[in-house]
């Protein structure tokens, strides 16, 4: 799948580098960033998009199930952002976007670990946004609802149909619709938007 995406992007004339790394490990994340910078130059735009689930009700949840999700989903924001933030501050420009989740806003049965990690991502966003604004760096969150990703499509079809029935627009989201929101925040015209959380969920959650 990764190779297909790389070929598609390269076909559009974009230079692409893929680097393996464990975003849950600070040393590995730093090495990953250095490898990218050596091949492509400084990182000006960072999308923190790591996400796993280890679903179970809290009274059955093991410490490992909790820690794995928090480490991958939330700690990765620190691990990957820390190596790039100084360069962004020095260059007086940057875009940092966290991909959180509707379940970080409304909670979800059996996902105390996942919901906590995704809610924490926006807490990270609004704090870093305050620290970084004067350096020309915007920091925002995108909180998708149920999108037809590999993770969601692995859910049994009858369950997916029940989920879609709860969405006012009547369907799951498409990955391109989330990418469009990310591209919006990256755009120079969005330079006055920072600390925001953009909900993209087909109307399933309308908190404000």
Model-flagged regions — what are they?
Residues 20-31, 63, 176-177:
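The beta1-alpha1 cofactor-binding region of Rossmann-like NAD(H)/NADP(H)-dependent oxidoreductases
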Residues 57-58, 62-70, 152, 163:
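Substrate-binding pocket helix/loop in short-chain dehydrogenase/reductase
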Residues 86, 130-131, 191:
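Alpha-helical segment proximal to the catalytic Tyr-Lys
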Residues 101:
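Residue(s) in the substrate-gating loop at a strand-loop-helix junction
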Residues 106-109, 183, 194-208:
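Short C-terminal tail/terminal secondary-structure segment
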Residues 133, 138, 193-195:
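Short, small/polar-rich loop/turn modules that mediate ligand/substrate recognition or access, typified
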């Amino acid at each position: 799948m990764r190779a297909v995406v790389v070929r598609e992007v390269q076909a559009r004339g974009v230079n692409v580098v893929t680097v393996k790394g464990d975003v849950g490990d600070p040393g590995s994340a730093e090495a990953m960033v250095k490898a990218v910078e050596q091949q492509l130059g400084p990182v000006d735009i960072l999308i923190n998009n790591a996400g796993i689930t280890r679903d179970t009700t809290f009274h059955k949840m093991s410490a490992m199930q909790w820690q794995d999700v928090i480490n991958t989903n939330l700690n990765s924001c620190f691990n990957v952002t820390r190596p790039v933030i100084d360069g962004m501050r020095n260059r007086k420009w940057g875009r940092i976007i966290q991909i959180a989740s509707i379940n970080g806003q409304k909670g979800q049965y059996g996902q105390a670990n996942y919901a906590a990690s995704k809610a924490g991502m926006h807490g990270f966003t609004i704090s870093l946004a305050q620290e970084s604004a004067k350096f020309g760096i915007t920091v925002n969150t995108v909180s998708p609802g149920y999108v037809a990703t590999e993770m969601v499509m692995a859910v049994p079809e009858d369950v997916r149909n029940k989920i879609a029935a709860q969405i006012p627009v009547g369907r799951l989201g498409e990955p391109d619709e989330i990418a469009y929101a990310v591209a919006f925040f990256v755009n120079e015209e969005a330079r006055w938007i920072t600390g925001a959380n953009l909900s993209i969920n087909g109307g399933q959650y309308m908190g404000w």
